[in-house]
């Protein structure tokens, strides 16, 4: 693993530790979910993505195969879970007895579900790349799209929060409280963790491209 990849991996690991502390202490949790659910559905896949990268780069073939099989199963389940959550959310919106217009929050929640679902799919392709040397371009493209969606949703949420704060002339403490309660801190740590890990993985993908 190159020096740059190691730096990005460390950044991702630190972000994951911060996320773990926030989740387990109940300081921050994904909206409308318990602390345990937040940990299971968000912390675990991020940790596995990071851990598998380290295993596949630094250990022998047998470790790669074990890590690869476990990760493909887990990330496949995660992608299916995100797809199910997305489907349930849309179904609920369509079948409401008194349908209401979609809000910015609804749109960003939908975007985040799609973004993380694509990210799980990208993770599967990345593991296959590490094991087989294939799917390099596919991994890069899907990962890039997923991050664009996730980061875009975060920016929109932040923009709406600032707009509301200006409109209601909110105090700084109220803005900070809203920033935390709206899940923006959680989302930011998630983005840093995933993005730094992806940057490390992208270095591996580019390294493979030079060897082709």
Predicted segments, located by residue:
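Membrane-embedded alpha-helical segments of multi-pass membrane proteins
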Residues: 40-51, 114-121, 188
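Membrane-embedded alpha-helical segments in integral membrane proteins
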Residues: 16-31, 52
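Membrane-proximal helix-loop-helix units in multi-pass membrane proteins
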Residues: 80-139
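Interfacial non-cytosolic loop connecting adjacent transmembrane helices
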Residues: 28-38, 88-114, 156-188
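Transmembrane alpha-helical segments of multi-pass membrane proteins
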Residues: 10-14, 65-83, 140-154
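Hydrophobic alpha-helical transmembrane segments and adjacent interfacial helices
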Residues: 20-27, 76-88, 151-159
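Cytosolic juxtamembrane helix at the C-terminal end of the final transmembrane segment
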Residues: 2-6, 55-64, 124-145, 161, ...
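Alpha-helical transmembrane segments
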Residues: 7-22, 76, 193
